[in-house]
Amino acid sequence: MPPETLAYLQTLIGSLDGNARLYQTALTHRSVIGNTALSHHNESNQRLEFLGDAVLGLLISHFLFQNFPASAEGDLSKTRAKIVNSKSLACFARSIGLGEHLLLGESAAHYNIRDSESALADAFESLIGAIYLDKGLDAAYGFVDKHIIHHQSFSAIVASEQNYKSCLIEYSQAHHVAAPVYTVIAEHGAEHDKEFTVEVSCNNIKGCGTARRKKDAEQLAAKEAMERIIALQPLPHEPKDEENSTTT
């Protein structure tokens, strides 16, 4: 593994615990296999991508199940699909500079596969699979929490599949707090061409929205509040210190 890639991985996920080869496989594109110049690499990241896809699906399903208790199965499935599709995963991969460290065959490098949506998405899932094998589910949770749940685009992805006002009601019910309160705080324009600015408050979290109809302004306010709530939510999992809990 190139020294710069080793340093990159150690910065990204911590100690590799003697499993550098596992992570190297996670970064190995299938174009490498059969490449005589890289004959020492005999496995691509496709198997790890298969595993990482399943682990990621579980973690995102857990997050959505816990945070949207009133959402129907179909709505949760649509939201999960949008989070884990290739476009979204490639975005998350680019944000951590993953493409710069992909190991590619000569032909793939020539066609700029390094920045392709599918290659980045596959490598991102492969890395999650490697983390799971090396460090366990808690570490995989931590990686997903940091690089997906708290990514700047995550709240917008989730909100795009939700009715924002309904989401706020679900949140208030799940956390046993008062229902959201909507207040018109400003009106602008002539009587026939007004714009309304609405503020919503829920559990001391506020959001604002402006639109020509109060109903639309309320939705925009709820969207902003939900984005702030999601940004503050950790994954609903507390790592267990099994060593400390075991008596000797």
Curated annotation (Swiss-Prot):
Gene Ontology CC: cytoplasm
Catalytic residues in the record: 53, 125
Ranges for domain DRBM: 163-231
PROSITE patterns: DS_RBD, RNASE_3_1, RNASE_3_2
Predominant location: cytoplasm
GO molecular function: double-stranded RNA binding; metal ion binding; ribonuclease III activity; rRNA binding
Residue span(s) of domain RNase III: 6-136
Cofactors required: Mg(2+)
Top-rank EC class of the record's enzyme: hydrolase
Gene Ontology biological process terms, A to Z: mRNA processing; regulation of gene expression; rRNA processing; tRNA processing
InterPro entries the UniProt entry points to: dsRBD_dom, RNase_III, RNase_III_dom, RNase_III_sf
Keywords in alphabetical order: Cytoplasm, Endonuclease, Hydrolase, Magnesium, Metal-binding, mRNA processing, Nuclease, RNA-binding, rRNA processing, rRNA-binding, tRNA processing
Enzyme Commission code(s) on record: 3.1.26.3
HAMAP family from the UniProt entry: RNase_III (MF_00104)
Record text on subunit structure and interactions: Homodimer.
The protein, known as: Ribonuclease 3
Source organism (scientific name): Chlorobium chlorochromatii (strain CaD3)
